[in-house]
């Protein structure tokens, strides 16, 4: 009996230890999780930045998300960055390491604020569905993610989320412009990597906004 209780106590200890590595905050619009206890300090700030950005994009893009947006904060890379997708669900992955300034221009002290502004533009641009998109999503039971094993799935995926297949330069151009605008004129639009988008718009005498 003593051996059983000792084993049970050790098991519960390790279970609690493993679960405590992750912290999660849920709101009506977001599920935000950190992958390490060392990142928990940023969650409160992250949820405020996420809601501020989403409220801004709601007004700008007339975007009304139909599902929660999952945000994961991690520190798996050497430089801060983010990624976003709308397939099959809305997901943002954010590395909160210091930014790389070799080809980019960002707000160093507020990289969480800047990254969330940028990545939520992607979510709004990718997930903002028309009536036909919503009809196909209802028909297929959600947004379809394409599979390399079944190339025809790309067609079904396009029907449910056509803006996912827009050129990357278009999505990045929108995101860096709005991000820089929201950051008060300091952002990736000033970096030489993304500046090509605006040079092209000026060269073609096209309307930027």
State where each predicted segment sits.
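Residue-level marker of positions within ordered structural domains that often coincide
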Residues: 10, 18-19, 62, 180
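Post-HExxH zinc-binding segment in Zn-dependent metallohydrolases
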Residues: 53, 128, 132-208
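Juxtacatalytic substrate-recognition/specificity segment
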Residues: 20-160
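Sec-dependent N-terminal signal peptides
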Residues: 4-16
